[in-house]
Amino acid sequence: MEVIQSFTIDHTHLKPGIYVSREDKGFTTFDLRITEPNQEPAVAPAAMHSLEHLMATWFRNSEAKDDVVYVGPMGCLTGMYIIMTGAYTVEDMQRLTIECLQWILTQTEVPATRPEACGNYLLHDLPMCKWESRRYLNRLQHDFHCEYTQLQVTLEDGMVFADA
């Protein structure tokens, strides 16, 4: 089996920011990296779940709503994936994400936290979601990263493999 693209990123040098994870068939997958993998704690599951509800709500009501395909958390809980159609850049996503995070900080409740609307409606933490949002907002505004450090593998025979 081939190694999937996201596993070729050197997570030991990955900083919080926004990255293009992949582009294919007219879709762009953006990696919204909230925490520094393996250096900082992952986002707590309840806070991440709230962040997912809030970000999905905002993006699906934003100027980009017709281009939003998917908004959801990474399994490692260090960030979110947003899949878009159209010609969005990391700078476009930076602007949109900053607007989204600013909106999240004004919210007093998490949307769709009822048993009929959410499969785990009790797993939410708005205060911690806002804490993570504030920290990520600061990083996007003052310490923006958008280029992956690729993992390179060199075999014993000298052959080098790296994600391009």
In which residue ranges do the predicted regions lie?
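Short secondary-structure junctions
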Residues: S62-K65
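Generic structural motif
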Residues: I18-V20, V68-P73
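Histidine-acidic residue clusters that define the catalytic metal-binding segment
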Residues: L140-A164
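A domain-level signal for the structural core that forms small-molecule/cofactor-binding pockets
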Residues: W58, C118, F161
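Short coil/turn segments at secondary-structure boundaries
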Residues: A42-S50, V68, Y81-Y88, D92
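Active-site-adjacent, His/Asp/Glu-enriched structural segments that form or flank metal-binding
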Residues: P73-H145
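Non-catalytic terminal extensions that flank enzyme cores
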Residues: M1-N38, V153, V160-A164
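Active/ligand-binding-proximal structured segments within catalytic/core domains
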Residues: F27-R60, Y70-V71
